């Protein structure tokens, strides 16, 4: 009698537990479906757009000046052409750029407000705010101080990384940014690397440590609806040269472990976008640098690592590209390689008509068959899906 009673009680408890588990799983599935549905419901009917407007979404433009008017070329590019976004810089005398976008907090807030007001479809307001040396919102301009990735990696305290990232993100939110071109997940393989290690941009040479700290940085941004971007794929940390100033070949220094932070973070499902490097590696592609390489972007990043989000080029105006390829070739190769969003910093050789000129250029490539309409739809679709998740009210 006692055994039968225990058995009935045991079966009843098991039934209750299984029912609770079933309800929990159904709730989770419903939540996922609701999230997916919510993202989809926010999307405008972009498929009905003209090919010109879809191409415009693929442009992330730089421009000179700390203020804009409705007649400014960037205002026209946003309002009339529908470009996907802008990227803001401070002055960079090292690169000969002395008229950019950031001088003080009040000026910046006004500029970003005016940029957003020009847009019918929400635009990316992007910045390279990595912390430490690579900071556009510098303390001397009146913004809060930040620390570098290398400092955080040396401390190796995830709580410190989280709190530091939270403070940085609060600044981005305060001024209206919605896309931070960070974190850097390059491995600090070459301590004399002029563009990574010497600029204190890497957490570590250890892929696991880089992955862990980058995950904290990403989480800080996501808590405040800021889009992030891993860079520089497939790895710039072993280089001896700087792609801002010339050709960079990592064939003899690059290693497979440089892919591990991407693999780890993509596997966690937290990666919004990935920026390509202008590095050349004959082991990955005997003909083209990563930004222009279908083998690297479509073959490794998408097929091998399983990433189906937005791929962003590093600036196509950098010397590693412009010294070796015409503008037309760079744009065509980048899009066909799998780049969805083209950064055109438009700095040392400023072109006020960069938006309509690039749109017309790509339209002609579509009409001639050099770039397929399907590829444009694929890129625009990824961009709009990302915007719906973070930018749409």
Regions from the PLM with identified roles:
Residues 1-11:
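N-terminal secretory signal peptides that target proteins for export/translocation
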Residues 30-31:
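C-terminal motif of bacterial Sec signal peptides marking the signal peptidase cleavage site
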Residues 34-139, 343, 385:
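N-terminal hydrophobic targeting/anchoring segments and the immediately downstream early-domain regions
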Residues 50, 69-73, 86, 98-118, ...:
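Second-shell residues forming the walls of enzyme active-site clefts
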Residues 64-66, 127-135, 139-140, 178-190, ...:
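Short glycine-enriched loops at secondary-structure junctions
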Residues 147-178, 182-214, 218-222:
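A substrate-binding/cap region within the structured catalytic cores of diverse enzymes
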Residues 361, 366-393:
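Mid-to-C-terminal alpha-helical segments outside catalytic/metal-binding sites
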């Amino acid at each position: 009698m006692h055994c039968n009673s225990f058995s009935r009680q045991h079966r009843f408890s098991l039934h209750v537990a299984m029912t609770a588990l079933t309800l929990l799983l159904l709730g989770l599935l419903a939540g996922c479906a609701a999230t997916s549905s919510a993202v989809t419901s926010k999307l405008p009917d972009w498929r009905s757009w003209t090919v010109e407007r879809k191409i415009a979404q693929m442009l992330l433009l730089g421009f000179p000046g700390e203020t804009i008017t409705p007649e400014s070329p960037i205002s026209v590019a946003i309002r009339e052409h529908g470009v996907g976004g802008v990227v803001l810089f401070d002055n960079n005398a090292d690169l000969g750029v002395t008229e950019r976008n950031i001088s003080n907090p009040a000026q910046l807030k006004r500029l970003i407000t005016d940029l957003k007001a020009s847009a019918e479809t929400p635009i990316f307001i992007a910045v390279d705010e990595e912390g430490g040396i690579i900071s556009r919102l510098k303390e001397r301009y009146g913004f809060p101080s930040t620390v570098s990735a290398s400092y955080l990696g040396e401390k190796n305290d995830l709580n410190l990384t989280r709190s530091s990232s939270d403070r940085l993100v609060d600044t981005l939110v305060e001024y209206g940014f919605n896309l931070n071109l960070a974190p850097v997940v390059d491995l600090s393989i070459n301590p004399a690397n002029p563009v990574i290690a010497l600029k204190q941009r890497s957490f570590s040479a250890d892929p696991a440590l880089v992955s862990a700290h980058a995950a904290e940085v990403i989480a800080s941004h996501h808590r405040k609806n800021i889009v992030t971007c891993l860079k520089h794929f497939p790895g710039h940390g072993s280089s001896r040269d700087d792609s801002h100033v010339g050709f960079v070949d990592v064939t003899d220094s690059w290693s497979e472990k440089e892919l591990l932070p991407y693999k780890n973070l993509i596997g966690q499902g937290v990666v919004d976008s990935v920026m390509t490097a202008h590095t050349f590696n004959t082991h990955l592609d005997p003909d083209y640098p990563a930004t222009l390489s279908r083998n690297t972007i479509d073959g490794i990043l998408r097929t091998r690592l399983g990433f189906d989000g937005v791929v962003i080029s590093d600036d196509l105006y950098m010397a590693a590209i412009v010294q070796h390829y015409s503008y037309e070739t760079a744009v065509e190769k980048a899009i066909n390689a799998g780049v969805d969003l083209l950064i055109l910093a438009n700095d040392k050789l400023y072109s006020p008509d960069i938006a309509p000129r690039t749109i017309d250029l790509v339209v002609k490539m579509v009409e001639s068959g050099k770039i397929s309409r399907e590829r444009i739809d694929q890129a625009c679709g990824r961009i709009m899906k990302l915007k719906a998740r973070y930018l749409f009210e």
